[in-house]
Design a protein with these regions (language model features):
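Terminal alpha-helical segments
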Residues: 1-109
Length: 109
């Protein structure tokens, strides 16, 4: 496996791991473990950047007139995973904020 296929799998692997980290961060926040949640967001961000950089490399290669990407289900899946991970991060950050507010209200009661 090389070229486009390898890059697609790199994207899928990295952003899939990022998405999993964001989902785990929600679980940590639900247990009021905000340090753990924030650590998982950071881990997810690192993996997301790895996937994003691989994707950007494909775009740059095509823009420079290199061998164009062939649109395949694999590349579509990689881009879908990239966008999904980005959405999960947004959701995870919102959930963490909500759980922080729940904890604060609980302490005030």
């Amino acid at each position: 496996m090389e070229g486009l296929e390898l890059t697609a799998f790199q994207i899928i692997s990295a952003v899939g791991t990022a998405r999993s980290s964001y989902i785990e961060a929600i679980q940590k926040a639900k247990a009021f473990d905000f340090e753990g949640a924030e650590a998982l967001i950071k881990e997810g961000d690192e993996m997301f950047v790895e996937g994003h950089n691989a994707h950007a490399g494909l775009l740059q290669q095509e823009a420079e007139g290199g061998p164009g990407s062939t649109l395949s289900l694999l590349i579509l899946h990689a881009e879908d995973q990239l966008m999904s991970a980005e959405g999960f991060k947004t959701i995870a950050l919102e959930f963490i904020d909500v759980y922080k507010k729940f904890e604060k209200i609980g302490k005030e009661l």
